[in-house]
Amino acid sequence: MKEREKFGSRLGFILVSAGCAIGIGNVWKFPYITGIYGGAAFILMYLVFLVALGLPIMVCEFTVGRGSRMGMGKALDTLEPKGTKWHRMKWISIFGSFLLMMFYTMVGGWMLKYAFMEATGTFVGLDGKAVEGVFGDMLTNPGTLTFWAIVAIVISFGACGFGLEKGIEKVTKVMMIALLLLMIALAVNSAFLPNAAAGIKFYLVPDFGEVAKKGFGNAVFAAMSQAFFTLSIGIGSMEIFGSYLDRKKRITGEAVNIVLLDTFVALMAGFIIIPVCFAYGVEPGSGPSLLFITLPTLFNNMAGGRIWGTLFFIFMSFAALSTIIAVFEEILAFFMDIGGWGRKKAVGVNFVLITVLSLPAILGFNVLSGIQPLGEGSNIMDMEDFLVSSNLLPLGSLVFVLFCVRKNGWGFENFLKEANEGEGIKFPHWIRLYMQYILPLIVVIIYLKGYYDMFSGKSTAMFVSWMCFAVLLLFVIFGVSIFTGRKKTGKVK
């Protein structure tokens, strides 16, 4: 059997894994949600949930990878006790990875397109209405969207094609270091804009009055959800890099480093965006309109705005591409582990698959805009995003946690032994009851709340049918967890 690839350095593992976690959500959502929920008051709650929720699930995912030395194609098969059906849950992983890439590659293409347009001066002299028109024209042109999505796909599969150490690790190291340097430069520039101090105050000074106004429960749930979704946990994109990790370091310490990097990027994004909005009297928003309409308009009004706009979208391109590369590797490993394929064959086949599968999201903004699967105003990308973010990420996370703690899964003792192999921060034994009961409950609450938020404003029939579907999926997960196989702790193989 061919020897498993390994990272060339510890830094490579940390930067590649952090690159997977760091995505566009760090930029187009975190600063806005921090500001409206009381600044530093929200950040404090967010950090608590990162440690209590995101970190242990990430440790579970990495540990399954390192313990099995396999991607999700065979990881659960390798570690599960005989007679159990945990391995069937691997399809959550591969389905989630493909579904995510069906729209994320398109959004990555948007970033590359905007970096190109900023660099070539497309936005120079345009007002907000004209910039909005540029974005609208891009969305209505399927040829443009397809071309830039393919550029993102080619770059990402190109990195994966050279293997772990010579391709993914080398390329992602360069991108992540450049990303961090670009962020610092952009944040320093924002800090010296007029009225920047007011923006920083809005962003960071604790405002418990805003928390009370928005509702403490709403603020807590917003912090909980952001902490959960920011780390890209649940579909195996972290697990695959755990399978390439040696046993010199304990996994908890490595996961802490990745969480810290992700948090740093999220916080720095606020230092870039919020002062810019305050400097030009614009309400800080979130989502695509912030990135593709508001910010290009503001860069036009800024001294050296064309340069800063170009640097910003290069930074955003790196954030998107680092995630795409990581998820592509998880997809490739699935085919290599399951089918025994070589890397080149896996790259070739999946290049075609991803390119074709990205077309519905692209056409959903133009040719197929009449298809509105989640109600009026929605599009195909919204549906794909909902299936990933509100379904497969929480359900996949639930599988990882239950598999690691239940006796008819891998078992907590086996999980703990593998997680604590090496030097560094130990994963505590006393956390067992929390992992078995409270953590799964929190994930279930996040999962069901996502459905409630999506469909509570729809018709009663739509709301009831989708909520029943959500509960049915939970029964499937817990059915495998509780009733599958013999009650015998799995062994590390």
Please describe what each predicted stretch is.
Residues 6-17, 42-45, 85-98, 146-152, ...:
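Select transmembrane alpha-helical segments in multipass membrane proteins
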Residues 11-49, 236-242, 252-256, 260-261, ...:
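Transmembrane helix-boundary motif of multi-pass solute transporters/channels
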Residues 33-37, 85-101, 136-140, 150-175, ...:
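Membrane-water interface regions at transmembrane-helix termini and the short interhelical loops
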Residues 2-7, 169, 173-321, 325-326, ...:
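Membrane-embedded translocation segments of transport machinery
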